[in-house]
Amino acid sequence: MMRGASRHSRRRRLARIVCVAVIAVMFVEASRGHARAASDSPIRGYWVPRAALDSVDTVRRVVNNAVAGAFDTVFVPIALTADASRGFDGAAELIREARDRHLRVQAWIDVNRVAVGDEFPASRAHVVYQHPEWLMVPRALAPELLTMDPRVPAYLGRLSRWTRSNRDRVDGLYMSPLDPEAASYVAGLVTESVQRYAVDGVYLDAVRFPGSDFDYSRRALDLFRSFERPRLSVGDRARLDEVEAIDPFGYPSEFPSEWAAFRQVRLTALLTRLHASLKLINPLLTVTASIAADDALAREEQFQDWRAWISDRLIDGVGRRNGNGITILLVPDGLLPEPTLLPAVGQASVGGSR
């Protein structure tokens, strides 16, 4: 009798711990008082397209659509640009309208992706123009870019053209988390953006590498070389010097496992900074992150150690792209979900959760 009661108790406890939420279809937030509705009924979330923030009319139209569709929450794209607050602030207007209509608000923020597809920034104050040396470089293009000064316009132009011609595998320009200065810049922008708006949670999109063949920029290679070199013997250093004389990828080629771990650790370090900054703004914010639809792709190609992110309480849940849209799984208290409870894997997409 006691054993049966224990099993029922465990089932009830598990049900309280994990709830699955399907964005654009339906999502259910986990059982935390600050992150859920007064009842345990499902909460419907409306994914706001960026184009809906262009004017007051489009903002009101999208809020009306959310209310008419019986959605309870809106996910609002927040731009990470230094001049995002100039002119009409569609995000602020949408949040005001949403609050007036008793809708909850989640901020949707691109982290490492700083330019999307063909939508490269017009303002020369944007980080892609001010610090092109911070942008990730694919290995295929690196031999050419390593011979160029990142400050000359031809450098960014070449990287942009390559990105446009490879849309099937990369969806924009990405800032590298390997450079400490770049990581500080990103963390600062995310903090400023969330401070500007009264939101209930933050969904971190594109907190990843586009693929395992990124980042082969000069700065990234130098950082990895500086990290590995002190651990080598004098003889190994001399040998690597000879290798580098003919192969600019000498250190990554000689130490592939360490190179992968280096990128994974630096990405996790960036997420750690983001989590600390966001919880300092508001400890009740839910922080979730987008991960690839395929688990191996997330770990081995995009360097997302998301299980450690959960167990270390860096995030409150994960989002996955599947055939039905975006699925968010909230996992409070750092408890890893059972594999069967993870969002089902559907179609993988280079574009992540866009």
PLM regions and their residue ranges:
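Boundary/entry segment of secreted carbohydrate-active catalytic domains
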Residues: 37-59, 291
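Catalytic domains of carbohydrate-active enzymes, especially glycoside hydrolases
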Residues: 58-82, 197, 317, 326
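Substrate-binding cleft/loops of secretory-pathway carbohydrate-active enzymes
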Residues: 212, 286-325
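Short, acidic/polar
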Residues: 52-67, 182-193, 297-312
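Aromatic-lined carbohydrate-recognition surfaces of secreted/lumenal glycan-active proteins
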Residues: 106-110, 203-210, 253-300
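Active-site-adjacent "subsite" loops/lids of carbohydrate-active enzymes
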Residues: 107-192, 196
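The substrate-binding groove and active-site-proximal loops of carbohydrate-active enzymes
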Residues: 45-53, 83-86, 169-184, 255-267, ...
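Substrate-binding cleft of secreted/luminal carbohydrate-active enzymes
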Residues: 314-354
